[in-house]
Regions:
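Bacterial N-terminal signal peptides that target proteins for export
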Residues: 7-29
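Bacterial N-terminal signal peptides
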Residues: 27-38
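Bacterial signal peptide processing site
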Residues: 40-43
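Amphipathic alpha-helical packing elements
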Residues: 48-88
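Solvent-exposed, acidic/flexible segments
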Residues: 54, 67, 74-81, 140-147, ...
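Acidic/histidine-rich, surface-exposed loop or edge segments in extracytoplasmic proteins
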Residues: 55-70, 128-136, 310-311, 328
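Acidic/His-rich structured neighborhood in mature extracellular/periplasmic domains
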Residues: 84-248
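Pan-zinc metallopeptidase signature
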Residues: 252-372
Length: 372
């Protein structure tokens, strides 16, 4: 999951070096390779090695909390994490397993760096296919430099490319995913939302459909956080969350409108030079619109400011669509089920059995993809 809208201060992750002496039983590299369907390529080998490193750092949260050397900030975060984790299973119907009941201090701000790419004249993301996850709209690396190396290669092939750090990910229940130190860079409510999101992936994951999977998990994240705040009687935080959701909807509306303009442009028979110029105009206009929205809302979106500074492109809009395009459809489905989560999950499972095109016709704007 990528936290799309806000970025915490750099180097704000609390450290818990004292707990590193505790270890849970290690999966072997062979087990990680089996999960990935083999480690016959350097890419899969780095993925397996990175996963083993994360799992090697796991410490039971109860152990961390009992350790008198645990920094106060880590202790406070993990106390709240433990409560949110119980709420996730007891009240949201999310998997009751060992995931997010341990902590891993990974010593860096992100656990992986995702590469998203789209053709020069398309907002459909390039897809990469893997044995377990199926085909997804990104390629992740446990170290930053290889992600940028791939980005340079793709750019040389004519793709628009984006590289983003990711604070959390899910192994879809294959391993007991820990709470990562990279996740503690965010506020406690964002941390709870991240756990709800990642557990939703464990509850339901459809091969070869990133948009469906991410929108489902984002919907569970939103609903779960609202119910978690209501459970705590956190009226002020609830209002802040709703205000943030409204700001997010306005921002996503700008991004999806720009995406629609580009889709129309790319479908036109314009000469290449003219299309390049008009593409640049769309992104210039979007930059102006984002900054006007920031002024009107009285907020700043650091992540999007970074995007503007680096140059907006098709890959940026493709990544936003992956997380948000189908969310309104999932929210409608939830309301149709009387806002009852078990009924909602059952309805989503039925949709998951349909062909991808039919799922998207019911929930999302159908879209094509570039394959490679």
């Amino acid at each position: 999951m990528v936290r799309m809208l806000t970025e915490p201060p750099a180097d704000s992750a609390p450290r818990a070096a004292a707990v590193r002496s505790w270890r849970v039983r290690l999966p072997t590299l062979a087990a990680a390779c089996a999960l990935l369907g083999g480690c016959g390529t350097p890419y899969l080998m780095q993925a397996a090695s990175g996963e083993v490193h994360v799992l090697h750092e796991r410490v039971p949260i109860d152990t961390v909390l009992a350790d008198p050397h645990t920094p106060a900030a880590v202790h406070e975060h993990l106390e709240r994490v433990r409560a949110a984790r119980e709420f996730a299973s007891q009240e949201l119907g999310l998997p009751d397993n060992d995931s997010y009941r341990s902590y891993a201090d990974i010593g860096r701000p992100y656990v992986v760096w995702n590469v998203v790419a789209a053709p020069e004249f398309s907002v459909a993301p390039k897809r990469w296919c893997f044995p377990v996850a199926g085909c997804v709209a990104y390629r992740g690396y446990f170290h930053e430099q290889p992600a940028h190396d791939l980005a340079l290669t793709l750019e040389s092939q004519g793709f628009d490319v984006a590289v983003d750090g990711v604070p959390a990910y899910s192994t879809l229940g294959k391993f007991a995913d820990p709470v990562l130190s990279s996740m503690l860079r965010y506020g406690d409510d964002d941390l709870a939302a991240t756990i709800f999101h990642e557990l939703a992936h464990q509850l339901l994951y459809v091969r070869d459909d990133s948009e469906f999977n991410e929108a489902f998990a984002t919907t569970v994240e939103y609903v779960g956080l609202e119910r978690w705040l209501a459970h705590q009687g956190a009226t002020a935080r609830m209002q802040a969350f709703r205000d943030e959701q409204q700001r997010e909807r306005e921002l996503v509306s700008l991004l999806t409108a720009a995406r629609a303009r580009l889709e129309q442009l790319y479908a036109s028979p314009l000469p290449r030079d003219e299309m390049v110029a008009k593409k640049a105009e769309v992104f210039t206009q979007l930059s102006v619109e984002i900054r006007a929205l920031e002024r009107r809302q009285g907020v700043t979106y650091p992540l999007y400011e970074e995007w503007i500074a680096a140059g907006l492109n098709n890959a940026r809009l493709a990544s936003v669509a992956t997380y948000f395009e189908c969310v309104p459809g999932f929210m409608r489905l939830l309301h149709e089920q009387g806002d009852d989560l078990p009924r909602f999950y059952a309805a989503v499972r039925k949709l998951a059995e349909l062909p991808r095109s039919e799922r998207h016709a019911r929930l999302c704007t159908p879209q094509t993809t570039a394959t490679g």
